[in-house]
Amino acid sequence: MMKSILALVLGTLSFAALADDQANDALVKRGEYLARAGDCVACHSVKGGQPFAGGLPMATPIGTIYSTNITPDKTTGIGDYSYDDFQKAVRHGVAKNGDTLYPAMPYPSYAVVSDEDMKALYAYFMHGVAPVAQANKDSDIPWPLSMRWPLAIWRGVFAPDVKAFQPAAQEDPVLARGRYLVEGLGHCGACHTPRSITMQEKALSNDGAHDYLSGSSAPIDGWTASNLRGDNRDGLGRWSEDDLRQFLRYGRNDHTAAFGGMTDVVEHSLQHLSDDDITAIARYLKSLGAKDASQTVFTQDDQVAKALWKGDDSQTGASVYVDSCAACHKTDGSRLSALLPGAAWQPGGAGEPDPTSLIHIVLTGGTLPGVQGAPTAITMPAFGWRLNDQQVADVVNFIRGSWGNGAKATVTAKDVASLRKDETVQAHQGNADIKVLEQQQ
């Protein structure tokens, strides 16, 4: 009888332990998914390095800062962080030692992340990520600008109170989920919302604020982030919800293809999200009204195409375009296939008020990553090695003024030289290879 009772007790304890292990495994797996949604690996890794080990340089107006090691290494990472330490860093912007984090860490967006999701993220980073012994790099910001106490003042003035996201009364649950992902974990506004002179985002949500997601006010690492609102020319007004779903999932659709920093978002984050979450994000973005409701829909102008078809490349920049660009982007500014962006108007591209992204991609090229469902990676070669500053300025002005793009020829050789100086280093920077991360799982 005693043996039977003992066996029953041991069996019950074993079952309970198994159930706990399964629950913990499920929590870690959920945290992994949420880390994908937050695209944590993109900033906290460098190309050729280990995922989440930090070291990615981020240029700021006052110097360069480097992302930190967020692996569970107890000496150089966050292995000795309690849950409270972790959530204070992520949602409040306060490190374990009490220092305020640089707002390159989007803690103002993460302030709405729920306790349940924070606990899952903590479980993943403590138990699902390989520890890496790699010391953090000090910033290149000179003293006295490197002092942290002004950041604490900035945080007190501009960071929102930490308050878990709550759907609005009668809000469509799909829209609510999309809003949570876009405004919270996805931190889309960190790049796509303009900032004030004091560097805070002009809006953290769409609550009566048409600045939200209306496009970056200044380049970020040499790229400008596009308007995600419903504007007809420089926004997503011409896109359907299905267009957005395709772009988010694959980084390409019938309108454009991803370039710049958005390629990392597609590769490391969006391609891994569920169909339901991709739909929720797309539906929420399509619910955003235009910032400038007076914008007319882009209309293609074929005058330049007709001239090029006749062999007339006398317009400044036209001969460079024909020699270097037309094979893929065609003489009418469209594109050879859905794998390539067109040279005619597209959000974030040829007709944008700020030409920085276009100059950047001409100089350094870019790669559209292969993703699940669209495995072919397509690379645009860099042309900075064989085009001088004046030639780059000429072809950028030609593209921006042709096919109905409507921009004036304002780019100078000096503008190109300035950006080229920065891109000499930046072109060789990047993020961790996603395959390295997948091999760890």
Swiss-Prot record:
Cofactors required: FAD
Pfam family, one: Cytochrom_C
Amino acids binding heme c 2: 188, 191-192
SUPFAM superfamilies: Cytochrome c
Keyword Cell membrane applies: yes
One Gene Ontology CC term in the entry: plasma membrane
pH curve summary: Optimum pH is 5.0.
Oligomer and partners: Heterotrimer.
Protein known as: Gluconate 2-dehydrogenase cytochrome c subunit
Organism field: Pantoea cypripedii (Pectobacterium cypripedii)
